[in-house]
């Protein structure tokens, strides 16, 4: 399967120059790109743009939000009409760092110690980005021209649902396969989906706190309600639906009950001198790959409207709903579509063979318990695999770390896959 002499030289180069790979991770981490607050990735993306231009890539860079640009670098294949193309995708933004967190070392000064590299974003996912870039540089160092197109995407906004990847798809970038180098501990993964939503209970009349007795006691004469208290019924209804889903729904690769409804944030009322005339609940729903977020939204709304009909006041003042969004920052909403993997596909079979050839171990296929931008690539019709270095429990954590051996092995596996995939003729 492999042109061993070429592959062996490439892999030896990675081993010989792993300090350069680690230095690249450190450079990327040194650009503080936490999201939120976001709007801080331009310098890091300019570095990546320059890096890719030196490799002979055609580079496209555009603002998704002010000071938050995407970068897409294309290595055009020598026979791109006949050979398979590949997208390497990753996000440059990282999880926020709170001042109260107790880091052993400064989070944006990545340090190497006892076989790990530590710093914000090393696992999620500047380690994966560095592996992609270093693999491309290794091909360039050996003057290897791939027959198929290689497209590298460094995108913004993943941490807050801003879907820089969706912007790439809308700009027309496509391929025969996409690999998202996000945190998967080098397992080949698909994922469930996530959608957030706002549920609002609103009274058309505002009551003084002094009239509460009239609202709740016999003979009070006022037909009104506290929006906060009515929201409590809806939360109870969500919990009942969540338990029902856990019993009645399942999906291969997921433990029972992964389809959750999280009442994540609530706000309501004006101040203590008023009966709360409005209450808003922000929820996060995880759903399975065989479901669509449109189906899930309909199911939740239908259930809560039935709950409301059982309440005399909410029967006349039903809750309203707002779903999804384009940004947790801009409009307080997000969608991450689900995607499944085809274990019999050429891509999965090739990646399995390469991993076994290089490590002597079978690579696992599974479903991620979190979400990535991979769903947007899949929704655009691109077969997609989540395959990247780092453990999920390290992502977003204080003292975030990545095992160096895993990063190096991932880089070698990815490099080999790039070479082999882009030398396969289109089906």
Curated annotation (Swiss-Prot):
Catalytic activity from the UniProt record: N-formyl-4-amino-5-aminomethyl-2-methylpyrimidine + H2O = 4-amino-5-aminomethyl-2-methylpyrimidine + formate
Protein name: N-formyl-4-amino-5-aminomethyl-2-methylpyrimidine deformylase
GO molecular function: hydrolase activity; metal ion binding
Entry annotation: catalytic residues: 93, 158
Entry binding sites for Zn(2+) 1: 91, 124, 182
The keyword Endoplasmic reticulum belongs to this UniProt entry's keyword annotation: no
Pathway: Cofactor biosynthesis; thiamine diphosphate biosynthesis
Organism, as annotated: Halalkalibacterium halodurans (strain ATCC BAA-125 / DSM 18197 / FERM 7344 / JCM 9153 / C-125)
Binding site for Zn(2+) 2: 124, 159, 396
Highest taxon, organism lineage: Bacteria
Listed InterPro entries: ArgE/DapE (IPR010182), Bact_exopeptidase_dim_dom (IPR036264), Peptidase_M20 (IPR002933), Peptidase_M20_dimer (IPR011650), Peptidase_M20A (IPR050072)
Cofactors named for this entry: Zn(2+); Co(2+)
The EC number(s) this enzyme carries: 3.5.1.-
Role noted for this protein: Catalyzes the deformylation of the formylaminopyrimidine N-formyl-4-amino-5-aminomethyl-2-methylpyrimidine (FAMP) to give the corresponding aminopyrimidine.
Keywords: Cobalt, Hydrolase, Metal-binding, Thiamine biosynthesis, Zinc
Uppermost EC category: hydrolase
Family listed: Belongs to the peptidase M20A family.
Keyword Oxidoreductase among record annotations: no
GO biological process, one term: thiamine biosynthetic process
Disulfide cysteine pairs (residue numbers): none
Cofactor note: Binds 2 Zn(2+) or Co(2+) ions per subunit.
